[in-house]
Amino acid sequence: MVMRTRNITEVAQFERANKRKIYRKGVTLIQVSATKGDVLQLEEDGLVESKYVVVESKGQILPDYLFFAIKHAFPPFFHKWRTGLNLQVSNIAKLEICFDDDVEVQKQFIREIKAILKLKKAYEEEIKVYEDVKKDMFTIFFN
């Protein structure tokens, strides 16, 4: 296991999204127009709005792992490089990400993070049920 810090241009390519181009599932999307620093992942092949930069791995990093690496590194980068409500596309080239170059470690990390996110979603759904019950109880008692 060897953790490396590299410039994004060494491990990925990026471009401003082209509204007419279909991008592959798993690419990372960085919102650069009217942004609050959103980093998303494309869930299925499709078109992407031009307010995003599309980041694709050059092969050293698995797409899901690249997404999590960018998402982790992005907040301080965003606060340093944003200009008003926007982020200059050219500044994305200054982003540094930390990653493990062992693909098996990347796969394990992805499995563990996805399991945690699945559990988080289940808890959020359970909390929503309790909130709905609470709302119903207030309606019954105070109406």
Task: Kindly label every feature range from the protein language model.
Residues M1-N18, R24-K25, F99-N143:
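Non-catalytic DNA-recognition/assembly elements of restriction-modification systems
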Residues V11, A69, P76-F78, I140:
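Residues that form generic nucleotide/phosphate-binding pockets
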Residues K21-Y23, G46-L47:
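A short catalytic or substrate-binding loop motif that flags glycine-/basic-rich loops and adjacent residues
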Residues R24-V32:
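Short, well-ordered secondary-structure micro-motifs within conserved domains or adaptor modules
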Residues K25, P75-P76:
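Short, solvent-exposed coil/turn segments at beta-strand boundaries
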Residues Q31-P75, R82, Q88-I92:
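A short beta-sheet element
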